[in-house]
């Protein structure tokens, strides 16, 4: 899957939507706040948006903040013939699903658990197996990106102690970040470092392009 091309396509769509949304309350509030912040009138900014495509980019929504990468992954996984009962899980709340110390828990059961636990993104079934997946698309290095890397390591750590039968945990890691060397451990790539943390029996690390063949192999 080419996430970068999908991002470019979506951001062009969002750019076109700026002028379509000029009369909406949210856009007018955004323009008003921007105008007040920099000392311009509402009318000046609105006219500039209409006539200047480059300036219009300031007000276009960032696809990355619209769950683009998770949505693309969800569309792809759910389209696979072998996948059944696919669900995108809530990121929080009582119906979210968490993995902690080998236990799969819904949000309403987390009262006495650590608040740092990240929810699982997707769940589906194949044949008699249930798959729980954490998905990350991480492009460049940085503090926030390193936190995502740590989230995956924590997910794999918590999966080790799970004794649920016919249950598989997947860390789906996409983006150039995972192809970079891990300077702390010396691993050739970060994804190889993550793969060393799995037992390759009930937990696995892979990218989305290898998911289809992986599911075919593990369910045969």
Where are these regions (language model features)?
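Glycine- and small hydrophobic-enriched segments that form the cores of compact globular domains
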Residues: 101, 115-116, 143, 178
């Amino acid at each position: 899957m080419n996430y970068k091309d999908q991002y470019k396509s979506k951001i062009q769509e969002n750019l076109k939507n700026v002028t379509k949304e000029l009369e909406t309350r949210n856009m007018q509030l955004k323009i008003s706040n921007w105008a007040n912040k920099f000392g311009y009138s509402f009318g000046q900014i609105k006219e500039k948006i209409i006539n200047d495509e480059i300036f219009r980019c300031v007000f276009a929504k960032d696809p990355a903040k619209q769950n683009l990468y998770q949505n693309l992954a969800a569309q792809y996984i759910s389209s696979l013939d072998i996948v059944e009962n696919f669900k995108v899980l809530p990121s929080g709340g009582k119906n979210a699903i968490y993995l902690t110390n080998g236990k799969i828990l819904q949000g309403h059961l987390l009262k006495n658990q650590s608040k740092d636990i990240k929810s699982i993104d997707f769940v589906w079934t194949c044949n008699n197996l249930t798959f729980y997946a954490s998905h990350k698309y991480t492009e460049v290095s940085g503090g926030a990106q390193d936190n995502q890397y740590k989230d995956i390591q924590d997910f794999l750590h918590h999966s080790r102690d799970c004794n649920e039968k016919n249950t598989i945990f997947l860390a789906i890691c996409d983006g150039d970040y995972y192809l970079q060397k891990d300077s702390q451990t010396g691993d050739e790539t970060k994804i190889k470092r993550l793969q060393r943390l799995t037992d390759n029996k009930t937990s696995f690390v892979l990218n989305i392009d290898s998911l289809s063949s992986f599911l075919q192999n593990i369910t045969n």
